[in-house]
Structure formats: C-alpha cells, structure tokens
Swiss-Prot record:
Keywords: Carbohydrate metabolism, Cytoplasm, Hydrolase, Magnesium, Metal-binding. GO terms for cellular component: cytoplasm; cytosol. Mg(2+) 1 binds at E89, D112, L114. NCBIfam families: PRK09293.1-1 (NF006778). Binds 2 magnesium ions per subunit. Mg(2+) 2 binds at D112, D115, E277. This is Fructose-1,6-bisphosphatase class 1. Pfam families: FBPase (PF00316), FBPase_C (PF18913). It comes from Yersinia pestis. It is found in: Cytoplasm. Substrate binds at D115, G116, S117, S118, N208, Y241, K271.
Amino acid sequence: MKTLGEFIVEKQLDFSHATGELTALLSAIKLGAKIIHRDINKAGLVDILGASGVSNIQGEDQMKLDLFANEKLKAALKARGEVAGIASEEEDDIVIFDGGRAENAKYVVLMDPLDGSSNIDVNVSVGTIFSIYRRITPFGTPITEEDFLQPGTKQVTAGYVVYGSSTMLVYTTGYGVHAFTYDPSLGVFCLSHEKVRYPATGCMYSINEGNYIKFPLGVKKYIKYCQEQDEATKRPYTSRYIGSLVADFHRNLLKGGIYIYPSTASHPQGKLRLLYECNPMAFLAEQAGGKATDGVNRILDIVPEKLHQRAPFFVGTKSMVEDAEGFIAKFPDEEAK
C-alpha cells in the first residue's frame, strides 16, 4: 500500500531540480480535504447545512459549507508558506497572503472549495477542485491578478477531491492522472488508481436535459444522436447527470462518457468558471487521454480576462467530445433560445 505522501516524494525524486515546495503545497491541500471530509460526514448533525444568507460576486447564494470549505483550505494553504495567494470561486478578489515567506513563494492556487454544495442537503456527492500555477510577478513583491489570469496550459498541477461513498483525491502534474482513496481509520490517502485513462469509447452523456429548449441547435442534435438506436456505436447512450461537476466528471473518467454544460441565452458564455472548474478538469482530461473544449476551442488555450470568467464546457472521452464538436460545427445557425 502506497500513500499519497510516499507517491509524491517518489515522483519528486525523478526531477533533480525539485525543491519539495510543490510537495508541501499538495500536503496542505490534502489536509484541507481531510477536514472537509470530516465535517461533510457530520453535516446533518451540526449547523453547517443550508444557505448562509450571503451571495458571491456572481449573485449566487453561498451555502454554509461553501464558506466553511473556503476558509479551511485558505488557512491550510497560508500556513505552509509555499503559496503567495489564492483565487477562489467564493472570494470576490484575489487573496494575497502576507507575512512569512509568502512574498517569495513560487505558487498561486485557484480553487472551487466545494463544487455541487447545493446537493449536500440530500447527501449527494460533492467535491473540491484545485489548480496550481507558478507566479509571474517578481519574487519579493505582492502578487497581482496577472498571476492568476494565465491560460490553462500554464498549470503546474490540477486535481479534485470527490466526497462520496468514499473520499478520493485525483491529481496530475502533467505526467498522468493518479487517484488516491482516503482510509479514515489510518488518516491517509492510499494509491488506488495509477495512470488513469479514459476508456477508448464511452457510453454515457451528462447534461441537464431540463434546459433542452435553451440549448444551441448543435447541442440538441447531439443529444438526439446520443438517444438514437445504433448497434455499431452502441447507442443509445445512457444519460447520467448528478448536478455536481466533480461527481459527473469522475464517473465519466472511469467509465467513459462526456460532460456538457453549453451556452444558453441566459448564460451565453456558459455557466462554469473557466479558472476554477474548466481549466483544472481540462488538464486532467487531457492527461487521461480525453478532450476538453468550449465546443469549438481547446479550453486550455483560452487566455482569461477576468477572475470569474465563464465558458461553455464539453469534456470527456475524446471521440465523444469530437462528435459533439462535429454537430456544433454542422448546425451553427440557431442561437440558444
């Protein structure tokens, strides 16, 4: 049995220039995940369920657990000294860490502390998403938004933690995707899936079909394609949509499938956040042999202009994403209604 800590140190030895700072940073994320895991498991017994009465910069109601997870991760990252600051879906602006080694720290972290938190009241899987970049601004100076507004190709590490029937941490540093399952009796994450790859073909599609009338024509046509009978392509595909990006992505990664959150008239740029959700998941998908686009363009090539920028998102088994892109290219004329 190999723990996450042992695995990271082992991989660090493959690089003579490694300083151990990224290893320490991942250890902080691991600690934050353990704390969130603990409190999610007793969420119905203590007063951390439901809305907080506060809205974020997008005007969305923040759940109590959103704020709890944000504060715990922020504290864990600040305490280590390897992080100059963070950007979070739950924060209006970047958070600059002061004191200690922060001004000379190499890295910045972007995160969605608790994805799918609206599901927590009904005991549905939720997750934490994180993305790590090297800072751009000079050492010894405060970081700025410039350090965070980098394309996804610049990510050093990305990953997520899914809190479900078991808690699992999945991450990549650009050398494959690896997954670790949490053993609460030992308090450690143990390697359970090494070098995870998407199956060559997929048979699941994940999209909120309740919004079908609002979708662009190409997306509607692709959904109908997924539902048609065809033995050669093993259609119809199975529809599976949890409403938690991490949970839907995780299932499709292991089983083969596509996750879609397209543009609509009410959300012409899509609804998912490019920096906190799309980029880290796109990095993981590509490292696992999958594909991630906005329907036309590679997600990781998009140069962000603002912290809370949104994007349409198509991610999963490469052939399925390419099929969806084909329908979008073939039926481009009808705008989302």
